[in-house]
Amino acid sequence: MAGSLNKVILIGNVGRDPEIRTTGEGKKIINLSLATTETWKDRITSERKERTEWHRVVIFSEGLVSVVERYVTKGSKLYIEGSLQTRKWNDNSGQEKYTTEVVLQNFNSQLILLDSKNSNNHTQDSGRSEYKHPEAKNHSFDHSDLDDEIPF
């Protein structure tokens, strides 16, 4: 395999108001819980069943932090793209602990507000508010710069 990919895409609802922390250097970090729910019909009983999975999300990107800070509250519906990371630490008793989180920190992270109730002035025609990290720009190639002659 030539490379690898670590990308997580989730659509879900925020379980509680985002937690905003500030590092010693003054950088803001946001932690939030995102619920995704799967529904299906039981083949035997024909009952509707559902299972909710909770995802820990950590946001380091300054632009995304400011959007979440202003517009995201408990119940907000979000589309997020990030990467999966597992952290390891020792608790107070010295026992190793692990947690796996969806991390939004670099140019390939994305967050879209899917419910219009929280998007206020950031509503597009589709009722969504979207923010991509500033480095995620579409660079188009200008074909007019090419010579008409083929070099071989």
Swiss-Prot record:
DNA-binding annotation, residue ranges on this chain: 54-60
CDD domains (UniProt xref): SSB_OBF
Bias type Polar residues, positions: 115-124
Transport among keywords: no
UniProt GO molecular function: single-stranded DNA binding
Keywords linked to the UniProt accession: DNA damage, DNA recombination, DNA repair, DNA replication, DNA-binding
GO biological process, one term: DNA recombination
SUPFAM superfamilies: Nucleic acid-binding proteins
Classification via InterPro entries: NA-bd_OB-fold (IPR012340), Primosome_PriB/ssb (IPR000424), ssDNA-bd (IPR011344)
Domain of life: Bacteria
Domain spans labelled SSB: 5-111
Pfam families, sorted: SSB
Its biological purpose: Plays an important role in DNA replication, recombination and repair. Binds to ssDNA and to an array of partner proteins to recruit them to their sites of action during DNA metabolism.
Protein name: Single-stranded DNA-binding protein
